[in-house]
Amino acid sequence: MYFRVLDHGVRPPADARARAYLLTDNWDDWFKYNTMYTLVVYNEEGASHSIGSVKIGQFGMEEGQRRPAIPKTFDTLNDRFFSLGQDDSYYEELNALGPEYRDRLLRDLKDVALDTELFQRALKEKVTGVSLLRAVTPASVQGQFYRIARGGTRLSRYKFSYTAPKPPRSRINPVRLEFAVKPESQPPTNIHVLIGRNGVGKTRLLNGMTRALVGAAAEDEDVGSFEGETEDLLDDRLFANLVSVTFSAFDPFGPLPDRQDKSSGVQYAYIGLRRSGLGEDGEPHPPRTPDQLSSVFGRSVWLCRQGARASRWRRALEMLEADPIFKDAEVASLAGNDLPEKEFRARARTLFSKLSSGHKIVLLTMTRLVETVEERTLVLLDEPEAHLHPPLLSAFIRALSDLLINRNGVGIIATHSPVVLQEVPKSCVWKVRRTNIRVEADRPEIETFGENVGILTREVFGLEVTDSGFHKMLRDAVSDSVGYGEVVDRFGGELGGEAKAIIRALIAAQSAGDDD
């Protein structure tokens, strides 16, 4: 294949035939490298195919060298160079050209997803870890990209478990949670839920999962352990990437630091109020201020505008526009904006500032998830319902599930909201409970996907529901009254349909007891 490199802003000629163009992109990686190009291919009939973003590295790049010294024209890159597509869609677009075109283009560009030996050599180069793998994990290259580059599928089947740490000085077996993901299932099985009352240890379980995956010196007896398999288990690592999401001001577990070099290990990103590390006084940094969260959002939206992330971000925003406030704010219009970086960030922050706190959290979280979620990512969310009303929570869960399916990832949500249960099947739900120091978990007895919230509440919380709130008031009134009419009169007739049904059931149960 004949290749020509075009300078930034220069377009291919209209009469191009049977050749490929690399359009120079000035995207900057950490002020160290400019390795990005856009690949456009013209067939023999002159039809153009925009393949997507690709980064090109060079063995032995000199200190201060920002761009690989590739020739302006070539048929095949020589062995000094190597390349990597920046998204699974890059390889899917190549597949659409047919296996002959795909294989020729990948070979001529020395693609490391096609050549595993070349990838292992490239991993030793600094430009690979800092630039080529900035938005891609090694697991994506060796797993999803490898499959697609050979015409294979893009989704994996997961089956794994997490065993919590054993309580100190206890003979009690720790709780063990099992998870399974089946590609293309309906309803989707890529989001799992831990539900239970406050204080049962849901947040502690998520924190243990985080430390078990990315804690540098963590011991299994302190943080627990994962076991399991996927179709692409690499280097004994179940997941390649972990994203932790929590906006609780009372979260006792501080975040771990993010990493710039992504050439090895499980990658980690934190989304929330807390900041990693300690201040000059040795104390944890204070939570992020609204202005700081706005800055985080401005930086993230700019990253989400690049390459294939832009289409994922647009789709997520459109799904969130099921909420009328998001729709009125036209948040999805951000994804189609072509302003320069400074103006774009300013517009994004202005839109962000006009939203309520709950809508800000959803928009920031979804944007950061689009930025950070890659192949084989585990997303851990702690009580997302704390800031969201039910319809917005449902829209967020659906957008998250859609993103995770696209990225071949898994989500685990800790919650006490039955609204979350409505969005997943019971095979993806663990009811968590605690007795003294013993934590246990069971599956729901009823199907949860699309079930009534009241029924789900009773299924999860059982007697806790009837011993609190309006249930207790109704039960006390029935025990002090002689009949249905008197109970209704006591509440001035201000009773909903469910309350009236509960009163009748309580009176019937009371009468049956008297007969005995």
Question: What would you call each of these model-derived segments?
Answer:
Residues 52, 58-61, 302-303, 392, ...:
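Intrinsic structural disorder/low-complexity segments
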Residues 55-63, 67-73, 78-91, 95, ...:
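ABC ATPase nucleotide-binding domain signature region
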Residues 117-186, 236, 249-257, 264, ...:
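Extended helical coiled-coil dimerization/tether regions that scaffold
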Residues 22, 39, 160-162, 176-179, ...:
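Generic structural hydrophobic/aromatic packing signal, biased to beta-strands
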Residues 40-46, 163-167, 509-512:
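Short, flexible beta-strand-to-coil junctions
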Residues 284-327, 332, 402, 419-422, ...:
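RecA-like P-loop NTPase motor core
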Residues 170-233, 341-473:
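Switch/communication elements of ASCE P-loop NTPase nucleotide-binding domains
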Residues 1-153:
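Long, basic/Gly/Ser/Thr-rich N-terminal segments
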